[in-house]
Amino acid sequence: MRTEYCGQLRLSHVGQQVTLCGWVNRRRDLGSLLFIDMRDREGIVQVFFDPDRADALKLASELRNEFCIQVTGTVRARDEKNINRDMATGEIEVLASSLTIINRADVLPLDSNHVNTEEARLKYRYLDLRRPEMAQRLKTRAKITSLVRRFMDDHGFLDIETPMLTKATPEGARDYLVPSRVHKGKFYALPQSPQLFKQLLMMSGFDRYYQIVKCFRDEDLRADRQPEFTQIDVETSFMTAPQVREVMEALVRHLWLEVKGVDLGDFPVMTFAEAERRYGSDKPDLRNPMELTDVADLLKSVEFAVFAGPANDPKGRVAALRVPGGASLTRKQIDEYGNFVKIYGAKGLAYIKVNERAKGLEGINSPVAKFLNAEIIEAILERTGAQDGDMIFFGADNKKIVADAMGALRLKVGKDLGLTDESKWAPLWVIDFPMFEDDGEGGLTAMHHPFTSPKDMTAAELKAAPENAVANAYDMVINGYEVGGGSVRIHNGDMQQTVFGILGINEEEQREKFGFLLDALKYGTPPHAGLAFGLDRLTMLLTGTDNIRDVIAFPKTTAAACLMTEAPSFANPTALAELSIQVVKKAENN
């Protein structure tokens, strides 16, 4: 039906007869002449109808936005004065000789000339995807997956599929369950990741595996998460953590070079402890130049419990954040930041405005200055590198609250004051995470997952002091987003059972949930390590959007619903009966 795409026509096509298929993007009727912007997935081209082709011109007068049409015509060069430098096809136009209206369009529920609500965009997603910016994002996503496959093939990785219907295993979120009709009362789980299957593939001898795979997590959704998402999943045997990072870094550098024309350079490596100390986050945005500075040792003897308490508590921390030029902040803005940190558990936000440092106490403005002598204030200014016109904010509490609150404040202030360089790319690796963290109930939970190997510890040493264990894990972070994470896996049965025990999984439960894995570990398991990238998040970064739904063709809302198909929906009672399932309604509270 077509000979060319609209958006691919150039001066080299001048004089050629072409047939185009697509949609009316815009129509301009000048009486004796009628122009349309005709659109397909590759872009837009101007088509015009003149009186010499009266039949085509008459039919064109019926055209409206989003009519699906076919046009045959001749490509012509535009006059110099009519060239549109903002269009890829702006140097040419098509003189139509014939027009076919393939399908007409009703009045559109979306307005291309205004910003539509996200609810409307998701309900009429098939129309939203016609927009050039949306089409371009999905084309970029397709390019990314193609680049990934070629890179992985070139590096000896095998694309191997793993099951979608599997067994529920604890991986940190709730599973989506699928009832079995054949096995009454039993359920499959949709995979949160192919984690155990890819480890089993290593045990099977497939030493380089990858897969671009759908994963499912039934969890409360944030703006950058979806209940079903896509991973670039990777596993290797006989490779160390640095070797895995080297190959995966090369993959991401390749993507940025091919898609953005940007060389990311070598990625710096930072430990979890350093990232938390300097940035208050295990996924720091290095485009923001501000850092946290520990000042607890300067404040242990002050008669101000807000500072002295955490300063003298081994589990406490007092950190300062110097904001260049922050002295210009108003009291209202400071109060807003004070309320902001309370979201993260902080009780408030102390500060020092540095007006003229050389004047000592007279050169600052601070509600806590009365608790601090000139010597302590000067020591704080010296350590933070404060200059005239700067602001210093303080966080004082337990280590987690200080990191969370001050890390979030750092990001917000950096964005608000334009201190974060939005034009930069800032990748890094974060390594050496704690293996376990407090579960809030007196026990421990795995920071990554229970199949991650500890670093430089025997099973006996791990059992004796699990709180000291460092995971042989690594995350890739770009511009403050965790785009991928992985680890060296446990390849020894005793170590795996020790980890399960630390997590409160008794031997009976171990056999019930992971018996197949424990059995497999008995038969010459190779050392193995891997990583998974979030394809959706990578695409989000590479297309310059901050909404993950913009890079998924048919996404869900934050309530895990599809507004277009109205999924989820109630099941047919007969189908439920076949599955031996009965829906029980909760009693309403009177």
Curated annotation (Swiss-Prot):
Keywords: Aminoacyl-tRNA synthetase, ATP-binding, Cytoplasm, Ligase, Nucleotide-binding, Protein biosynthesis. GO terms for biological process: aspartyl-tRNA aminoacylation. GO terms for cellular component: cytoplasm. The keyword Protein biosynthesis applies. L-aspartate binds at E171, R217, H448, R489. GO terms for molecular function: aspartate-tRNA ligase activity; ATP binding; nucleic acid binding. Disulfide bonds: none annotated. It is found in: Cytoplasm. Residues 195-198 are annotated as: Aspartate. Transmembrane segments: none annotated. Its EC number is 6.1.1.12. It catalyses: tRNA(Asp) + L-aspartate + ATP = L-aspartyl-tRNA(Asp) + AMP + diphosphate. ATP binds at R217, D218, E219, Q226, E482, G534, L535, D536, R537. Its main location: cytoplasm. Homodimer. PANTHER family: ASPARTATE--TRNA LIGASE, MITOCHONDRIAL, ASPARTYL/LYSYL-TRNA SYNTHETASE. Belongs to the class-II aminoacyl-tRNA synthetase family. Type 1 subfamily. Catalyzes the attachment of L-aspartate to tRNA(Asp) in a two-step reaction: L-aspartate is first activated by ATP to form Asp-AMP and then transferred to the acceptor end of tRNA(Asp). This is Aspartate--tRNA ligase. It comes from Escherichia coli O127:H6 (strain E2348/69 / EPEC). The lineage of its organism: Bacteria, Pseudomonadati, Pseudomonadota, Gammaproteobacteria, Enterobacterales. The gene is aspS.
